């Protein structure tokens, strides 16, 4: 009796997911589904561009980043520090707010929700709260302790499909009130951390958080090159992306940087636009011809638009525009 020969199927779960998402787009249906950052950063490294990680601080920030990424057809990472999460009401509040806006705004580009510079307990809390990616910052710990905690966290996160970022060499500057001098990571230590199975690595190369001083000497691109060679195909992360000269950003991407963190520039843009609005008397309830300019929806709009402009500029600089088309 004739039997049909079984054919091997080359339809992977990843391809199936893309197909489902594509059909939903055609049908006008949106499914709220944040993704981890692993694949988008692998694609970025292979394509020699970088995905923007933009820190969020409130609803305006989240909405501004999401809508700009959608308009530019760019994958994006929403980062939140422990301090910002506390300000917004906790990790579950942040996760629910991001998921709710992602759905209501009809966002179709890949979006990851990422804990930025989390300690061990914060990373575990974010995994439980519904984040899709976490950073364990053990750079201030003795190296062997950093290794052990990273190993434990990788096992927990990967069991739930969550990506993990680790750090070697503390990033300088001030983050949530903690000030540290910038360090330059050891390529061999980077290699050991990568061997633990992390998904992407932040390595200090002279970068700092906050505003760069006038006497800043620039990125140690020679060290970055050695780290890239030592760690193979692992996507590298550049923290403190605000204020680094564009030519150094481009050079860093060429040396394997696939994720760039931006926070300070968005904060400065938001503050400047809001201050200007108030200085012009638009929020003064006694001003003539005032149309309720003190309404927070109007008061915060200039800052919201300023964040969008900054995010757009960075997406273009990082080469991410159109990568989610």
Language-model features: locations:
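N-terminal amphipathic alpha-helix/helix-capping segment at the start of soluble metabolic enzymes
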Residues: 29-52
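Short, positively charged and aromatic/hydrophobic N-terminal segments
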Residues: 10-29
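Short gly/pro/ser/thr-enriched loop/turn and capping motifs at secondary-structure boundaries
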Residues: 84-86, 141-143, 266-271
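Active-site proximal loops enriched in glycine and acidic residues that flank catalytic Cys/His/Asp
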Residues: 205, 240-242, 264
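C-terminal alpha-helical cap/extension of soluble enzyme domains
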Residues: 246-325
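Glycine-rich beta-to-alpha transition loops that act as phosphate-gripper elements at the mouths
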Residues: 56, 113-119, 235-246
């Amino acid at each position: 009796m004739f039997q049909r020969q079984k054919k091997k199927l080359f339809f992977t779960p990843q391809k199936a997911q893309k197909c489902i998402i594509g059909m939903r787009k055609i049908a006008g249906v949106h499914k709220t589904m944040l993704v981890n950052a692993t694949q988008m950063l692998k694609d970025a490294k292979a394509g020699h561009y970088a995905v923007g990680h933009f820190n969020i601080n409130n609803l305006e920030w989240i909405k501004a980043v999401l809508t700009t990424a959608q308009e530019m057809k760019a994958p994006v990472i929403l980062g939140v520090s422990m301090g910002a999460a506390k300000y917004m009401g906790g990790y579950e509040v942040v996760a629910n707010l991001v998921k709710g806006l992602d759905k209501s705004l009809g966002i179709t580009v890949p979006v990851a929700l990422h804990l930025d510079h989390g300690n061990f307990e914060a990373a575990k809390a974010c995994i439980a709260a519904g984040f899709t990616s976490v950073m364990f910052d053990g750079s201030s710990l003795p190296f062997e302790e950093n290794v052990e905690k990273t190993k434990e966290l990788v096992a927990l996160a990967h069991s739930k499909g969550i990506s993990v970022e680790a750090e070697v060499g503390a990033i300088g500057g001030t983050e949530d009130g903690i000030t540290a001098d910038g360090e330059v990571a050891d390529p061999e230590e980077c290699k050991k951390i990568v061997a633990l199975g992390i998904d992407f690595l932040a390595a200090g190369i002279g970068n700092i958080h906050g505003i760069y001083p006038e006497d800043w000497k620039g990125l140690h691109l020679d060290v970055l090159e050695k780290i890239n060679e030592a760690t193979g195909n692992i996507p590298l992360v550049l923290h403190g992306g605000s204020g680094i000269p564009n030519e150094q950003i481009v050079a860093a991407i060429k040396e394997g940087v696939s994720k760039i963190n931006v926070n300070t520039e968005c904060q400065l843009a938001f503050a400047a636009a809001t201050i200007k609005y108030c200085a012009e008397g638009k929020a003064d309830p006694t001003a003539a011809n005032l149309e309720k300019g003190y309404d927070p929806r109007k008061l915060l709009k200039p800052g919201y638009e300023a964040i969008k402009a900054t995010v757009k500029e960075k997406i273009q600089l990082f080469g991410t525009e159109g990568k989610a088309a």
